[in-house]
Amino acid sequence: MIIRSPEPEVKILVDRDPIKTSFEEWARPGHFSRTIAKGPDTTTWIWNLHADAHDFDSHTSDLEEISRKVFSAHFGQLSIIFLWLSGMYFHGARFSNYEAWLSDPTHIGPSAQVVWPIVGQEILNGDVGGGFRGIQITSGFFQMWRASGITNELQLYCTAIGALVFAALMLFAGWFHYHKAAPKLAWFQDVESMLNHHLAGLLGLGSLSWAGHQVHVSLPINQFLNAGVDPKEIPLPHEFILNRDLLAQLYPSFAEGATPFFTLNWSKYAEFLTFRGGLDPVTGGLWLTDIAHHHLAIAILFLIAGHMYRTNWGIGHGLKDILEAHKGPFTGQGHKGLYEILTTSWHAQLSLNLAMLGSLTIVVAHHMYSMPPYPYLATDYGTQLSLFTHHMWIGGFLIVGAAAHAAIFMVRDYDPTTRYNDLLDRVLRHRDAIISHLNWACIFLGFHSFGLYIHNDTMSALGRPQDMFSDTAIQLQPVFAQWIQNTHALAPSATAPGATTSTSLTWGGGDLVAVGGKVALLPIPLGTADFLVHHIHAFTIHVTVLILLKGVLFARSSRLIPDKANLGFRFPCDGPGRGGTCQVSAWDHVFLGLFWMYNSISVVIFHFSWKMQSDVWGSISDQGVLTHITGGNFAQSSITINGWLRDFLWAQASQVIQSYGSSLSAYGLFFLGAHFVWAFSLMFLFSGRGYWQELIESIVWAHNKLKVAPATQPRALSIVQGRAVGVTHYLLGGIATTWAFFLARIIAVG
């Protein structure tokens, strides 16, 4: 008789076939809501349909079902992303001058779109050099493809097809994990396992495989390209992977294989895993060998991090323990209870993630120009400006989204009965002190930062330049910023002896790097003008935070409306008979926060655009004479409001205003059209609901007279709907206007 130990029970973490796949149900508009599914009585129905289609909280209160819907929707989102990527690569393969650009990136502009001559708009196809006519693109894809070692259009086709396959796979996964094998709630809440897999898998193995690709494919191919070898002569990627001798010709240590790794003689690999700092003078980008080294190091860190959390083996950290041990001398229960919040409220979790990702995106914006990662990126001024602007906008939206979901969490998921004296409770209990102090800071910053400009405008108008705040009169030098710049510029000889150059040329010290007579990067001087505009940045950011934080901290209750939580996330007013309680919902704070986010980002991208054109971007002659695009006028012009209007907005708008009849004319039309979209938003923001209801009723009367009245009764937009439409057009109109202004300018002069 054989005695066996009892088999360990495996936890079943999925439900099989929980929900049947029904096209009939999907075809019924509003199938997720009993009220909406009845069909339209009034035109408000279509608005409610859109507002609630993805508000899974309103479909059901079952957390497991909500989690499954979100999980499934994420696969749908990934599918769309793969489809978009595939389109980008397909355009590169089918409609672009990528191969020509690769052979001469300094004189040929990147283009991946050719306009068909339907009604004479082939004027939009400008000459980008090399005999190619098309629209100049500023997405940075060409530079990224070169960095990853793509040398011909066939490779782009293959990648595009691969992305389509992945898009289909994701679409299937979204259906499968909702209808066939849907994870149980416990699976979504198993944070340690999730951390291990995401850290070690996505970030660790992801970085490791990218480092491997760079070492075995990108580095050798880029070395050939930098040496001027014709792309058609360069061996194909698989040849480098399969034939070690090929690599050994470029990097002799490859002949030794993995021996130096196992014998800890790692310095052998210093040929292709470097620690140089600074920029490659041939391409004006970071050294690709530095980037490979970086990804290898990151991979090691995340592979270790992915083994830190306690799962089936009883060793490692437990998130709950970490959070509950986190107590300070003044924070009561500290983070106790936070674990429960973050595993039962996806809004709280999402809020945290959006705040982090938004901040990270803005960090990316600042690194893309100061440490340009791809070859020939730094000298493509249109792409530099686009990447900075794009990442700033995205970061701003994500941070506002963080506040939005924090407020939704407060209204829908926060349970005050179980929370006592933990960190969140303590913050809520002294919210008045927080908000009033923050308000004071905003007033101080606003008056002082704007006051400095007003002083300068006044002195300038009175003809008293000696009494202005400027580098040549009363100096307000940003001494702390300059100190940070100097510390970093001196780091290679002092605090980072292993590096040969500082991390970024912008810190100072180093010489400028120019590629093909164009400036890639140089030390950026900071002066009084930067000091002034930086305080405007501080002001706009603090006001944005004030609005958003007030929305979160007063989402459930306030002195004005103690029972706000019962009214929900968005509501127009606290019922009839209570004047002065309109526009106080958490949603309204997000609405107002969006406008200030727009203010903040606009000042940042204007500052960046002008500063770079004035002090960094430009050309260098054979004699070594440096000429900047706007000739260094930032320091003296941007210190007055009038200077911003005259020498930045007006002077630089000439290209977009005069673009008609040229290949940039689309930007002129967008500039006009986006101004209209923006102005259209004011109609929604400045007029009341009753005005439109009256107008509609008189129009309906006319229709009834002619017996053409519709069955669905027309209604004016609700207050919240009107404001939503208003802010959407305001932001889209403003962003598209800025886009047209920036690109027409920089493509014409850059």
Curated annotation (Swiss-Prot):
One of the record's GO molecular function terms: oxidoreductase activity
Positions annotated to bind chlorophyll a: M683, Y691
Gene3D superfamilies hit by this protein: Photosystem I PsaA/PsaB
Reaction catalyzed: reduced [plastocyanin] + hnu + oxidized [2Fe-2S]-[ferredoxin] = oxidized [plastocyanin] + reduced [2Fe-2S]-[ferredoxin]
Binding-site positions, chlorophyll a': H675
Binding site for phylloquinone: W692
Membrane topology, as annotated: Multi-pass membrane protein
Family annotation (InterPro entries): PSI_PsaA, PSI_PsaA/B, PSI_PsaA/B_CS, PSI_PsaA/B_sf
GO biological process, one term: photosynthesis
Co-factor: note: P700 is a chlorophyll a/chlorophyll a' dimer, A0 is one or more chlorophyll a, A1 is one or both phylloquinones and FX is a shared 4Fe-4S iron-sulfur center.
Residue intervals passing through the bilayer: 70-93, 156-179, 195-219, 291-309, 346-369, 385-411, 433-455, 531-549, 589-610, 664-686, 724-744
Binding residues annotated for [4Fe-4S] cluster, in chain numbering: C573, C582
Subcellular locations according to the entry: Plastid, Chloroplast thylakoid membrane
Quaternary structure, from the entry: The PsaA/B heterodimer binds the P700 chlorophyll special pair and subsequent electron acceptors. PSI consists of a core antenna complex that captures photons, and an electron transfer chain that converts photonic excitation into a charge separation. The eukaryotic PSI reaction center is composed of at least 11 subunits.
Family under the similarity heading: Belongs to the PsaA/PsaB family.
Function of the molecule: PsaA and PsaB bind P700, the primary electron donor of photosystem I (PSI), as well as the electron acceptors A0, A1 and FX. PSI is a plastocyanin-ferredoxin oxidoreductase, converting photonic excitation into a charge separation, which transfers an electron from the donor P700 chlorophyll pair to the spectroscopically characterized acceptors A0, A1, FX, FA and FB in turn. Oxidized P700 is reduced on the lumenal side of the thylakoid membrane by plastocyanin.
Designated name of the protein: Photosystem I P700 chlorophyll a apoprotein A1
